[in-house]
Amino acid sequence: MANVSLRNVGKSYGDVHISKDINLEINEGEFVVFVGPSGCGKSTLLRMIAGLEDITTGELYIGEKLMNDVEPSKRGIGMVFQSYALYPHLDVADNMSFGLKLAGVKKNERDQRVNQVAEILQLAHLLDRKPKALSGGQRQRVAIGRTLVSQPEVFLLDEPLSNLDAALRVQMRVEISKLHKKLNRTMIYVTHDQVEAMTLADKIVVLNAGGVAQVGKPLELYHYPANRFVAGFIGSPKMNFLPVKVTAVEENQVKIELPDANHHNFWIPVSGEGVNIGENLSLGIRPEHLVPAEQAQVSLRGIVQVVELLGNETQIHLEIPEIKQPSLIYRQNDVILVNEGDEMNIGIVPERCHLFKEDGTACQRLFAEKGV
């Protein structure tokens, strides 16, 4: 088990910058998830930690040792890729022990490590099977087991669940979470799926355009995003955004005007620092934080465009006539029977709102959310 430190790390190919000025501290035994859209540099960052990509600028430390020029095999890391990369002609036991055999580990010790890891991953009854006789989830566990038997100090996982169907992804998320708690190893996990990030991580690193957009615990990022990008990326369905104008500013609250027919004005409990009267901002509110109109002092009138009945919840896409933008999503943990074209009023609770400046940075929220 070891800590990982990245100090002003960058990667470029000629004049093209893939990652830039990455500063991260990953503690011993921590489960950290790198998340972001395709092309944001998350897999490149993981490969730099693994030693599969050279670091152009900055320094990488694993366990307080500078690793920039250390070979991958000597970094004390183990890596699981999106592809299982199992040898089809070898059984599970031989696949798991293959790396140990190449490293010259004696057979008795190889067998002992394989059996211990097989018990942890519930593979003991499959050790004599070939990969073709295994399910997708079992193959992924074998790939994880192959890494575990090498006893790495840092465990790297590059989108390991991407090839699995939805049900298996849920199952393997649970298995990986249990595995981390049991082993207490430092784990760094890459995914584009923010649901995986929210459910697995002790700490999430949100990446965008090769840089760090925000680092924090899952609920911190959900309730207190540092910028509009993080607010829109974390959460499913994603946050709604409405254009608003500032009409008054105080130290601990900002008054805004909605662009609807009634031009509603109301105060939002956020820091007024750096906000000016007349400024155009973005109001953010999550679909699950909208409420029935009778439960709020401020409401919006919308036209129902699409209704998604999911059994345990309903998601309604609304068009706000005065606002030319993508539809507003309203989510409730109940069955709501409405039809396309119906008028519907929804309520806004100021305490659950976010405000973002024109440059995308968030006004500091002052409402205390549970669990943060």
From Swiss-Prot:
Major subcellular site: membrane
Subcellular location: Cell inner membrane
Positions with a binding annotation for ATP: 36-43
Domain ABC transporter: 4-234
Keywords assigned by UniProt, alphabetized: ATP-binding, Cell inner membrane, Cell membrane, Membrane, Nucleotide-binding, Sugar transport, Translocase, Transport
EC numbers: 7.5.2.1
Highest taxon of source: Bacteria
Record-linked Pfam families: ABC_tran, OB_MalK
Keyword Transcription regulation recorded: no
SUPFAM superfamilies: MOP-like, P-loop containing nucleoside triphosphate hydrolases
Catalytic activity: D-maltose(out) + ATP + H2O = D-maltose(in) + ADP + phosphate + H(+)
Membrane topology recorded in Swiss-Prot or TrEMBL: Peripheral membrane protein
Subunit structure: The complex is composed of two ATP-binding proteins (MalK), two transmembrane proteins (MalG and MalK) and a solute-binding protein (MalE).
Family of this protein: Belongs to the ABC transporter superfamily. Maltooligosaccharide importer (TC 3.A.1.1.1) family.
Chain's role: Part of the ABC transporter complex MalEFGK involved in maltose/maltodextrin import. Responsible for energy coupling to the transport system.
Record-given protein name: Maltose/maltodextrin import ATP-binding protein MalK
Lineage: Bacteria, Pseudomonadati, Pseudomonadota, Gammaproteobacteria, Pasteurellales
Gene that encodes the chain: malK
